[in-house]
Amino acid sequence: MTAAAGSAGHAAVPLLLCALLVPGGAYVLDDSDGLGREFDGVGAVSGGGATSRLLVNYPEPYRSQILDYLFKPNFGASLHILKVEIGGDGQTTDGTEPSHMHYALDENFFRGYEWWLMKEAKKRNPNIILMGLPWSFPGWIGKGFNWPYVNLQLTAYYIMTWIVGAKHYHDLDIDYIGIWNERSFDINYIKVLRRMLNYQGLDRVKIIASDNLWEPISASMLLDSELLKVIDVIGAHYPGTHTVKDAKLTKKKLWSSEDFSTLNSDVGAGCLGRILNQNYVNGYMTATIAWNLVASYYEQLPYGRCGLMTAQEPWSGHYVVESPIWVSAHTTQFTQPGWYYLKTVGHLEKGGSYVALTDGLGNLTIIVETMSHKQSACIRPFLPYFNVSRQFATFVLKGSFSEIPELQVWYTKLGKPSERYLFKQLDSLWLLDSSSTFTLELQEDEIFTLTTLTVGSKGSYPLPPKSEPFPQIYEDDFDVDYPFFSEAPNFADQTGVFEYFTNIEDPGEHRFTLRQVLNQRPITWAADAYNTISIIGDYKWSNLTVRCDVYIETPEKGGVFIAGRVNKGGILIRSARGIFFWIFANGTYRVTGDLAGWVIYALGRVDVTAKKWYTLTLIIKGRLSSGMLNGKTVWKNIPVSFPKNGWAAIGTHSFEFAQFDNFHVEATR
């Protein structure tokens, strides 16, 4: 007797009541012996770094639609947790995010876009949990060392100001704060941070540590009772669904505080579907946080399209609601932080897993996944082979769930396009005459959610505009008097921080500019370049003309560049190749084939000094390139054979103040 049938290709998706005797595993879902661990939610990371960079430039209504798919309850991913980078001015994977304190006496709580993003998330879901975590720190924190623990009080003060600023300027309550992403922790610093938070009346802000591996933080907590007391959650990254004995012995909440990081294809969706269940089944992790929230960065940067959805074309408005959004919905739309897992969770006989959660008020949500090995391999760690095959799974509801009359059914099938379904609602399942028992026929690469809740929905908007390449002619004069965001559209800083700037002393043509504002190397998380650089455009550009007005602020030692065909960014920025046209305050110019300046095509003298505006022009066509200063040719037809294509860019010789204006690029692929 088939209770409900949705179609999957030409085959039915049967839900069978117990009246039909079928072989297979039997799984009891029961709360008679109490409940399991408290569920803390499903979330995603914005940052680590600059992963939401292009999102802010999207025109309406598309930007709001993207945000709805991510945060709006019972619409799309419906995330419970948003974790953001506390910008520290350093390169943190796909770019830099600005600090709220570039310098020791500087405070600005409107830089970057994480404040805005948190407010947009809260606007859609007032109950969303907010987390902050630093990847890099501004250089002054280290007092000459590439280390944030030189002065523990100073670093704790810096983090505390971010939390206080979030509340004072944006009315945002930060719920959790981390230590240092995937880097060393300092036991005394964690204690100092807790004391400082308490002193500031921030007792409610919980500490999560150490956003790296389970060890040595777990063992350290077992050996230090004060440390054990001040850490609320142990957060591990990419745990492969498993934890360690020491972590469990702490009796603290265990989270996969960064996971996924996989191309958002159906394989990435399968990865997410598997770990959302098995992080708890195997490792007792009660929250899973995906990196990253939305792939809103140039796709050729590291980890392209490793977000829950893709929004990397603000110039066209095009975005893609990828399958991980709907895999997330299977859990997020039918649970809430504060629900509890049942103790009766586990693996299916022929592969896959099941979890069940309750709000303690009679509601029940069951999530069953049968992700195959080939369909669910995450980017890391290595996934040992396992087999999943067709099976029947019989579930028996006992305890307070034995009287449930009806379950709503939601279904996903990943893989072949002809059989593919994403978050499809099937007919509900009636249990009144079934002795609270039902059987699922399961194929591989499926997800079922069965729930008493009727709130689920597959949200949708009209299709966004079609995909378009970056405009071949693009210009920006940076003439923005009161910018809503601190950074100019589409520029993606890869080392250094480039911000809108107002020249109070220059009422003329260059009153509003883009300025590189770091004068000191940050405490780095990745291999930042020794030069600052911001990229823009289409990675496929080959023939292009870049023109920009430039202003060197540092006498004698200062220098700036414009560039084309820049072929690397993110954590690989130090080794970027391209064609770079430099001028220096000492009256010299240089043409190099790399950002580091090792490959020199030409050099010589020019009439250049600091504190004066110049117009640089770089022309690249085929195998030849030329450069002009104030409209006069400085070098011409220099052979350049590599790379064949890449972004346009601007930047400085070192961590120094410099300004850019009237940027213009004209390109062909």
UniProtKB/Swiss-Prot annotation:
Source superkingdom: Eukaryota
GO biological process, one term: galactosylceramide catabolic process
Residues with attached carbohydrate: N363, N387, N543, N586
Residues annotated as signal peptide: 1-26
Primary enzyme class: hydrolase
Catalytic residues identified in the record: E182, E258
Functional summary from the UniProt entry: Hydrolyzes the galactose ester bonds of glycolipids such as galactosylceramide and galactosylsphingosine. Enzyme with very low activity responsible for the lysosomal catabolism of galactosylceramide, a major lipid in myelin, kidney and epithelial cells of small intestine and colon.
Family, per entry: Belongs to the glycosyl hydrolase 59 family.
Name assigned to this protein: Galactocerebrosidase
